[in-house]
């Protein structure tokens, strides 16, 4: 799928205590990544990833004043049947759902996770170790 021969070091979100890159950037295929919108960290990510030859698409993020390292729409869970998109009960949820519906050809299922996010995780992160 990736067939990459290099490791790219990326910055972390200031409030992120987990160090999970899946809060900021996700591979869609071997050449294309989706990353948080062009806030400060998003611009750094885009520059780094484009320098390494990747195509970069932007995805909405929660407002800066509300976002922690785990309040991320990019920490979605993708299965063969659907994309489960984390939402938080905030205004930008609608924008993120619309963006996901354009990005993926399978159904997008919003999942309210404010308590899960507050505890330091997201949908993709909690799925590690599960067999699909």
Language model: regions and residue ranges:
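Histidine/cysteine-enriched polar flanking segments
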Residues: 1-132
